[in-house]
């Protein structure tokens, strides 16, 4: 306790460490603010334990613990990994059932795509990770704020039957609450929020609040998002303003601001209490834009009959999920651009598009001008098969048509408010097309489809509430899979490296393939490894390259006579760069595939029609391993001639690179 008091006295020397109460709280309350928000609570803490913590510091408090919401998925893999760093730490955490997931058996955990989560249906969650603490005086509350980032007292709690802080790694995380006391009413005033990213791992709410309060007086609250179990910072948060002009000014002034050794990244965010207004404005904008949105197919006169038949099938099959009830499922709002399970309202705005069980089209609003259809497809792809993506010219919106209704539902809930290009996107139902009514996938039960995707299949739905819970869980599972895939891609890109075009050109991949291969059988192994590491795609500031950015030269050759061999020797020798196809001129019908044997990484097939295909693996960056030669040729300028191989084709398979599947593609501009 003495160490905590000493740390507090040191912190009080700096006036910016202890922030002032929010101006809105002071103006709307007759009592001085003395209530704090307290976060990063151990999952086993209860009111009595928290009161005892403050009692150890000679402070009498009243605690209001916020209970956890049902069906909240809490990851336990992060805690497990952190607890396995040292055997001593792991042994200490065994004393607290909440600090380690090693004590959970398989029945208490859910495994989704290699990530373990606590099963809320079998494990009791005591609270949502935070509470509100009311002190006797404002002076006591300010003293408590001075304890930010200091370790919690460690003692044996009889109510939890464990130590409160055995590792001394759980620290105080405190900030002013919106209400002056626990009984004070919180006025519903407009809030204007900013997303703040690239925070230091040690930055607290009080630090961030102090930083913004010195420049903007209307700052109301600050939140730094943390891991629900370990309490470690996720290095981003949100700042709420009471004045929109100050938020606009903060966006300009605080972007790139140096804070605790890092440059801040700032963007607009949407606060929770503004979502209803946002949804109304979005609905009006959607109706205007959908007048310009052409249907992919013409209306089918048999559509209503098929819908009626689908509903009858659902009613007659207890294992089917009533899709006509899913439109009442609440949207999963990403609070202020972040990730959360908080509900904004009980249902989406009711309209004909929303209630149509055959509709699989999602309207995407709030796109930045540079967003491409490929980016939009990549964003929504983890939620299920996509039939079509369209961004109207000159409009900051788009439409994503899914194959299945439940995937569209999941994407609306899972990506609502997701930050894309620094701006949160707005999602709702778009105008349906008749092709939605022509597929049987719209009447597929949710439990059946979830199982086919490797997700944990829920029990059959028997009520609307159960349908909401199933959809929320399904959307959350897909969203976590999406974020996990993004993280894996970023880690892979970091491992591969991020070399500039000049560095790649300096590696001279052409000379290596064309000369060293014939000279020394691919050179040494170390040279090959260095080549693989250096030959990586060029990454722009806004991410990877996309198909429309490939401006490939024409590979159509028209040599005559003996010039054929020389011409083919001048083909781009960037094995594994891309797949091309060429139509041989009639005057060279006697040439064989062996005359083009210049690239050890190339497979070449010549059929009886003298159409020659040269395939190089893998395909260009951004197309994925599943793309074929036709996919690649379509995006070239001009399109290349593709001739399918016939049964009587004669082929010559050329030598393969020993590690051809591991060599990443190069930037297409080097092919010019």
From Swiss-Prot:
It comes from the Eukaryota. InterPro entries: Nucleotide-bd_a/b_plait_sf (IPR012677), RBD_domain_sf (IPR035979), RBM42_RBP45_47-like (IPR050825), RRM_dom (IPR000504). Residues 1-40, 77-102, 640-672 are annotated as: Disordered. Pfam families: RRM_1 (PF00076). Residues 36-159, 192-271, 360-432 form the RRM domain. GO terms for molecular function: mRNA binding. The modification Phosphoserine is found at residue 524. Keywords: Acetylation, Phosphoprotein, Repeat, RNA-binding. Residues 1-13, 23-32 have a biased composition (Polar residues). May be an RNA-binding protein involved in control of an RNA processing pathway that influences the regulation of cell growth in early log phase. Can bind to RNA and single-stranded DNA but not double-stranded DNA. Present with 1540 molecules/cell in log phase SD medium. This is Negative growth regulatory protein NGR1. It comes from Saccharomyces cerevisiae (strain ATCC 204508 / S288c).
